[in-house]
């Protein structure tokens, strides 16, 4: 979303407005190069970033991490009087969970809180966030504008990560290889799914290929998963717009990236074999979005039911039976 907004503002900025994109030096070189063709880029590791931070009138971000709104970190008390910006929060994704303990006004002081759905917006207004109706606006996610269609016979499996599998990440490097990963229910479920003979047989029969993409935090565990003639296990960077465009259907669990796929009106199957533990371990609570009644596809709680749903879906050429829910959630699909 940040790149989409930066591109638009750089092209349409009124006189006197100076948009600057902040990024880390460890970002992919092609991403940095692409951003520099759009406008001015500054690295958050540099002192220049802190200068621009103190000069900013507005900070627009899809991240609400502490560094986004406090570049001076532990030196904040010495500079707080120079913090004169309004924080516009684009959201990392659709806010379907209750993040009020984290995103409330007293913690993040969001000036404008962008939303995608009517229920999403109302949950924030009615919840413990303490934002007014005027501060919560429905715009959709900027990245929706970059979505496109190029549908092929491809099944995309894209699950979220698990906070409970703490050995597979750390706070600094994000992703580290964890020897115990193969003993987790998470690994056993998804490795079982991409190697299930009933599913593979149906995909071969119908001419489908599969793509399994791990969350970036679990990326180093790709070597644990068994490849076969149907499924490829992605080993690195994922161009989400490309895989969304090319996939006919998606399997995911709790990832809000499913809303991007649903925006394309393509079918989704949710795999929530660990629902109770997931919400006990994550940093947010269940919110307004009930997958069983609001979700854009069936919810499966075990491997057999997931395979059954996918076999039926592929047998019916991935026809979306949940299109009404999609159209009811999104205010505008253009």
PLM features per residue range, with description:
Residues 1-147:
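Active-site and donor-binding regions of nucleotide-sugar-utilizing enzymes
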Residues 2-5, 10-13, 137, 141-224, ...:
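Conserved catalytic-core segment of nucleotide-activated headgroup transferases in glycan assembly
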Residues 20, 42, 60, 88-90, ...:
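Hydrophobic/aromatic beta-strand patches that form the interior of the parallel beta-sheet core
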Residues 42-51, 211, 216-259, 264:
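Donor nucleotide-activated moiety binding/catalytic core segment of transferases
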Residues 67-69, 164, 258-259:
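Short glycine-rich, flexible loops that bind phosphorylated cofactors or substrates
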Residues 72-93, 173-182, 266-277:
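A short, gly/pro- and small-residue-rich
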Residues 223-229, 254-330:
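Catalytic binding pocket for nucleotide-activated donors in carbohydrate/polymer assembly enzymes
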Residues 333-334:
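C-terminal alpha-helical cap of glycosyltransferases
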């Amino acid at each position: 979303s940040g790149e989409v907004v930066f591109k638009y503002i750089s092209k349409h900025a009124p006189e006197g407005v100076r948009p600057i994109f902040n990024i880390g030096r460890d970002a992919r070189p092609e991403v940095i190069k692409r951003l520099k063709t759009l406008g001015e880029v500054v690295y958050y590791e540099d002192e220049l970033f802190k200068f621009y931070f103190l000069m900013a009138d507005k900070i627009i971000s899809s991240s609400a991490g502490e560094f986004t709104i406090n570049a001076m970190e532990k030196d904040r008390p010495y500079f707080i009087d120079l913090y004169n910006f309004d924080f516009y929060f684009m959201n990392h994704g659709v806010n379907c969970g209750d993040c009020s303990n984290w995103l409330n006004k007293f913690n993040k002081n969001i000036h404008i809180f962008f939303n995608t759905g009517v229920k999403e917006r109302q949950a924030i207004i009615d919840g413990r966030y303490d934002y007014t109706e005027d501060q919560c606006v429905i715009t959709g996610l900027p990245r929706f504008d970059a979505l496109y269609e190029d549908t092929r016979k491809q099944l995309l499996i894209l699950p979220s990560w698990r906070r409970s599998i703490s050995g597979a990440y750390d706070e600094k490097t994000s992703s580290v290889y964890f020897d115990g990963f193969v003993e987790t229910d998470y690994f056993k479920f998804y490795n079982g799914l991409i190697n299930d003979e009933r599913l593979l047989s149906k995909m071969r029969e119908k001419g489908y290929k599969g793509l399994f993409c791990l969350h970036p935090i679990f990326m180093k565990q790709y070597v644990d998963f068994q490849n076969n003639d149907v499924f490829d296990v992605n080993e690195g960077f994922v161009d989400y717009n490309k895989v969304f465009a090319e996939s006919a259907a998606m399997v995911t669990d709790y990832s809000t990236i499913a809303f991007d796929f649903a925006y394309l009106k393509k079918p989704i199957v949710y795999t929530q074999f660990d629902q109770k533990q997931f919400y006990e371990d994550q940093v947010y609570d269940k919110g307004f979005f009930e997958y069983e009644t609001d979700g854009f596809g069936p919810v499966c709680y075990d491997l057999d039911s997931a395979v059954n749903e996918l076999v039926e879906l592929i047998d019916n050429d991935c026809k979306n039976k949940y299109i009404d829910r999609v159209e009811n959630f999104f205010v505008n699909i253009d």
